[in-house]
């Protein structure tokens, strides 16, 4: 009888362990990723969550080369996600992954919210790389580059959001 109780107990522990493992965060990150990395000998340290939530920068935006989507170079982002040209995604050198940003093309006023899920661009003077579809929606796909403003909206799984000023309402009676 003791042996049967022991087998049942061990089985329950094994089932509980499997259930717990299946509920953990996918893609190897717990909410967000701020691990330092190195590309071509250059060291990059992603911003902390608090620093990222105040991030608001203007600079040059570019878009991923489409040939890398359809050739042998098709691959995964830094989070291990598949890259497809129709996704509205972006890459940034120092923002924690993933995060949501609003990119505004300052040449034409168009803006778009997108998910940053990769590191890059690694070309001097550029602040963000967007997918071909995002570049088309922002109106700079033909030009290749644009002056853009990048504002962080949230970091990670959405738990960390930029605080917006509360609107004050005046009531007149």
Residue spans of the language-model regions?
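Secreted/periplasmic proteins
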Residues: 23-173
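Sec-dependent bacterial lipoprotein signal peptides
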Residues: 1-21
